[in-house]
Regions:
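C-terminal engagement/docking regions of AAA+ P-loop ATPases
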Residues: 418-435
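Extended, charged/polar low-complexity intrinsically disordered regions
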Residues: 1-164
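AAA+/P-loop NTPase substrate/partner-engagement loops
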Residues: 206, 217-264
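Short glycine-/polar-rich loops that comprise or flank the Walker A/P-loop
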Residues: 111-115, 195-196, 248, 299-301, ...
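Conserved AAA+/SF3 P-loop NTPase catalytic/coupling segment centered on the Walker-B
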Residues: 208, 247-275, 301, 311-318, ...
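Phosphate-sensing "switch" segment of ASCE/P-loop ATPases
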Residues: 295-303, 308-410, 414
Length: 435
């Protein structure tokens, strides 16, 4: 058996069929392939439904004095050494942070995971009786085995794509460069310390949403199909609770072609101003009058914008200018576009031609991404592109570092810097809408 076949077989053994319409997929996140009896599965699925479905959850509150649910914390604040949290089902309760962790580092890492929560009805209403994280620890043993196999064959890019359900064996070289950037926001440049921001405008049915769902459910990205409110995104002043940027590892804004129809330019402008500052300086303004003495919080997170192209433009005889084309969406300021590493305007193959839907179990997948990041951190060979200026030049370095860590040979030193930099820029601002 060849090394590549051995790698694919290993991935198959440690993966599951990911279907975003399958309500039972949470079992793979929580159990990571562990086999349990059917009765336990049913109990877990009901607890999960109570944790995400507000009406289903409320129906149990009407009849029981104790309710168990599985959910993530969507907002929280700390007051008098107690965590006050809002969950996906709308329930708000407080708990001692020692219930989920013994130290600050573990608390920080676990606060965004799926929680098992048991609440009881008391004299003064419902209260949290027990709470703890139920996600398994990252499986570095299996991840390292896969990583070493791919590294040996210089196929890290293939391992990454395969791990997210893409079928590299079906892909042509061009396809690899069209789909790989969807996963770049998982990584951080060791040179500029920036994470990768990405815009994709492509046809429907290419697997965008499926990939974004994995980023949401496994890597704790926050997924939006409409513009977020300031309270949801940054800070809820009414309830004095942290917003999405404080509890997520990234933001995904999908279906952006619909945004301008439902929101005023003033509303979009306010959100864009916040996003622009957050993208550049990792500074998110919380506003005055909050309980915290600090008016701003620093956190660096990547952002993905995605949507579908306008039909009137697809059939033009020439490719549109990439950034000019995005003016159609009325949500991108020049400041935001300046902070985007990669923009793709592309007609891509549909998912049936490039996806096998076999995704690594989350405990392995998260460990694999960590290992790839370590490889990125140890990559320091790049060229400075004199054809680019300022921020764009720094972004080109970030992309060179990540591509090389994924075993994409840029042939640095074997061809002219001018040729390489031109290719990198075309990768950063790509369009085939007029092809």
């Amino acid at each position: 058996m060849s090394s590549q076949s051995h790698l694919l077989e290993k991935i198959k053994i440690h993966s599951f069929f990911y279907n975003p319409r399958d309500t039972e997929r949470v079992l793979n996140i929580i159990l990571s392939g562990k086999q349990i009896e059917e009765r336990k599965k049913i109990e877990i699925l009901k607890a999960y439904k109570r944790g995400i479905d507000q009406q289903y959850f409320q129906s149990y509150l009407l009849f029981d004095n104790e309710v168990k649910f599985i959910s993530k914390i969507t907002n929280f604040k700390v007051k008098n050494d107690t965590v006050i949290a809002r969950f996906q089902n709308g329930f708000i309760g407080n708990f001692d942070p020692h219930q989920i962790a013994d130290n600050p580092e573990d608390f920080y890492n676990l606060i965004t995971s799926y929680m098992f929560v048991k609440i009881r009805k008391g004299v003064n209403g419902w209260y949290i009786n027990d709470i703890y994280s139920i996600e398994p620890q990252n499986n570095y043993e299996i991840a390292k085995e896969l990583f070493d196999l791919a590294n040996q064959e210089h196929q890290t890019y293939a391992l990454l794509l395969q791990s997210f359900g893409y079928d590299v064996q079906k892909m042509e070289i061009q396809d690899i460069f069209l789909y790989l950037p969807r996963l770049f926001p998982l990584f951080k440049s060791p040179i500029t310390k920036r994470q990768i921001n990405y815009v994709e405008i492509s046809n429907r049915g290419t697997g965008k949403t499926t990939t974004f769902m994995i980023l949401q459910e496994v890597f704790n990205f926050r997924y939006y199909t409409e513009p977020p409110t300031y309270a949801n995104l940054v800070y809820d002043a009414r309830n004095n609770m942290y917003g999405a940027v404080f509890l997520s590892n990234g933001l995904i804004f999908d279906e952006i072609q619909n945004w301008k129809d439902g929101f005023s330019s003033k509303e979009l402008g306010a959100i864009n101003a916040t996003l622009s500052t957050g993208l550049e300086n990792c500074v998110w303004t919380r506003g005055a009058g909050t309980e915290s003495k600090s008016s701003t919080i620093q956190k660096c997170i990547p952002i993905i914008y995605a949507g579908n192209p306008y039909n009137m433009t697809i059939n033009k005889l020439r490719n549109p200018d990439v950034e000019d084309y995005l003016v159609n969406y009325q949500i991108f300021t020049s400041a935001i576009l300046d902070r985007i590493h990669i923009i793709q305007l592309a007609i891509k193959k549909t998912y049936d031609k490039i996806i096998n839907a076999r995704v690594l179990y989350p405990s392995i997948l998260k460990a694999l991404v960590d290992l790839i990041q370590q490889k990125i951190n140890n990559t320091n060979n790049y060229v400075v592109c004199d054809n680019l200026e300022s921020r764009r030049q720094e972004q080109s370095i970030d992309i060179q570092i990540i591509l090389q860590a994924l075993d994409i040979d840029l042939q640095i030193g074997q061809r002219s810097n001018e040729e390489l930099c031109k290719q990198i820029y075309n990768f950063m601002r790509f369009s085939n809408l007029g092809d």
